[in-house]
Regions:
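Short alpha-helical elements of helix-turn-helix
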Residues: 11, 15, 104-107
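Helix-turn-helix
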Residues: 12, 16, 20-54, 58
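Hydrophobic alpha-helical connector segments
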Residues: 58, 72-102, 154-161
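Short, basic, alpha-helical segments at the C-terminal edge of helix-turn-helix-like DNA-binding modules
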Residues: 61-68
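N-terminal intrinsically disordered/low-complexity leader segments
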Residues: 1-8
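Amphipathic alpha-helical segments used for helix-helix packing
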Residues: 98-119
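C-terminal peripheral helix-coil segments that are non-catalytic and often amphipathic
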Residues: 24, 88-96, 132-141, 145, ...
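Amphipathic alpha-helical packing segments from all-alpha helical-bundle domains
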Residues: 84, 118-144, 156-159
Length: 197
């Protein structure tokens, strides 16, 4: 029975932590703010997490990473070309208001914490590598299907897609828009079309 009571508290803490850290950053987010927003006493948090760092690490694993798979969905789709998959993912990202307004949550956290915390650096870097590898595999399928020429360096182009996308998502909210993001994605697809067979 106690386990049932703790589970909703833990889930609520993770959800609110994701929102707070995404919008305000790790440093500006206080445990007190998270607890106040959640309506949870501090003692309840310590049943689940030793402190802020452990809470945010759990949030990264259980909330941020699954969201990244949705935001950057570069999985091959039956009956669709690689270009169609990329186009569909970019279109979905352009419709995601928080992503356009606040940028990529993984990238934001990485920029803030990787230089100062080894634990976060390893965790976040591992995810970035996985994303690049998945994207490279998708591009490789494009080569194997004859969509792209073999001269396409899939690893380099996967890095280019992620890094340039993070760059455009890092603009200040006043400069960001779905239209601007779609223009950026169009440039990526035009560059990729240079390798079309």
């Amino acid at each position: 029975m106690p386990k049932q009571n703790r589970q909703p508290t833990r889930e609520k803490l993770l959800d609110i932590t994701f929102d707070e850290v995404y919008i305000h950053g790790y440093t500006a987010t206080s445990v007190d703010t998270i607890l106040k927003t959640a309506g949870i006493p501090k003692g309840s948090m310590y049943h689940h997490f030793k402190g802020k760092k452990e809470l945010v690490l759990a949030m990264v694993e259980e909330r941020l990473f699954p969201k990244m798979e949705l935001f950057f969905d570069f999985e091959p789709k039956e009956g669709k070309s690689v270009t169609d998959v990329l186009q569909g993912t970019f279109a979905a990202m352009a419709k995601n208001k928080p992503l356009i307004t606040y940028g990529c949550p993984l990238y934001r956290l990485m920029v803030e914490l990787s230089p100062i915390d080894v634990t976060f650096d390893k965790l976040l870097s591992t995810r970035v590598t996985k994303m690049q590898d998945n994207l490279a595999l998708l591009l490789q399928k494009g080569i194997e299907s004859g969509e792209f020429d073999e001269t396409l360096n899939v690893k380099d182009f996967a890095s280019y897609i992620l890094e340039s996308t993070w760059g455009v998502l890092s603009l200040s909210p006043s400069l960001s828009s779905s239209k601007h993001f779609l223009l950026h994605s169009k440039f990526i697809l035009e560059t990729l079309s240079n390798y079309n067979n």
